[in-house]
Regions:
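Cytosolic/nucleoplasmic/matrix-facing N-terminal domains/tails
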Residues: 1-141
């Protein structure tokens, strides 16, 4: 298993790409291979505090490794949180999704297609919570 190194990022988890069947993509490439295209839109249209929502993927040998901003508090899946913490992070998730929805309404057609494909499936099992932020792995799948 080879690991990538990304500045200020840390490996959170990995998934097998065969676990998913409905890949979103750009041309023939699945979204996880077009992170730079997606992040370019995020960087230009999303407030800085919400830009880390989409984890950075790295694909190798059938596995997709997901990297996120460095953490202090150990990340936990949203679906696994106890009720008090879950309520707190649900609110952060809703604020984050609102930012992305507002951005979608202002994008040109190409940017809209790219970002909406990345956000098509959002499942709490793939949202990790830490340090008062939420991040999504397995996006665009």
């Amino acid at each position: 298993m080879m690991k990538a190194t990304f500045y200020n990022k840390r490996l959170l988890c990995y998934i097998d790409d065969t676990d998913f069947t409905d890949y979103q993509g750009i041309g023939a490439d699945p979204m996880y291979l077009r992170y730079d295209s997606v992040y370019g839109i995020v960087q230009n249209h999303i407030a800085e505090e919400y830009r880390d929502f989409l984890a950075r993927p790295f694909f190798e040998d059938g596995l997709i490794y997901w990297y996120v901003a460095e953490w202090i508090e150990t990340p936990v899946q949203l679906s696994e949180l106890d009720s008090s913490k879950k309520e707190h992070y649900e609110q952060i998730k809703e604020e984050t999704l609102k930012q992305y929805a507002n951005a979608l309404s202002q994008l040109n057609a190409d940017e809209y297609n790219i970002l909406s494909s990345a956000l098509k499936y959002i499942n709490d099992d793939f949202i990790y919570c830490y340090d008062d932020k939420v991040v999504l792995v397995a996006w665009g799948m």
